[in-house]
């Protein structure tokens, strides 16, 4: 995550209540991000309870509950039980239905910080997904504090990474000249080793809340978020490609076809 985005994400984690969502396809690192956030929040003074399916990692000092649909313990049922234990932070492995979402909203309204995941292509699309589930727009506006969308790309190995001058058609197609002052503009190729995250962070603000109240579409929400400083997954990827972290091909592989 870029430095401004990381600072904004940590600011959202520092809030005493609200819903913070992490979204992306399967295998995009959502659970890892949530566990990292929980580790940061995990102090002796803070009571944290998770509801997961499955529990992927054991976190010391955190009460983690595995849902068991076969015996009637689903996400909604587990959440109803843990809210009575008055936790400070609740992590829901995934918001899958309206009932689970309503409990998350109510938990936020009663002073809990709620972390969870969705499967959407972008941060803005998560808002319309919640609306499609049947959550009232005013409840989303008053409880969702931020949404982090992410993708994983393969990282170029510095030992084999080679720079080359970006062709004019690629510069024009992707607007690379607006993203760097470097001349000539360089891109990179080589072998891959490890992975890097592309991120976009939507922070709820008054303009977005106003758009929510009139049921604006995801594109309008994203445009408003960009005016407030949101950097899209695609733009974050282009910047990483220009920095030699990954290749342009990798960025396009994971962001092409995204629509809001």
Where do the language-model regions lie?
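Short, flexible helix-loop junctions that flank or precede catalytic/ligand sites
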Residues: 1-260
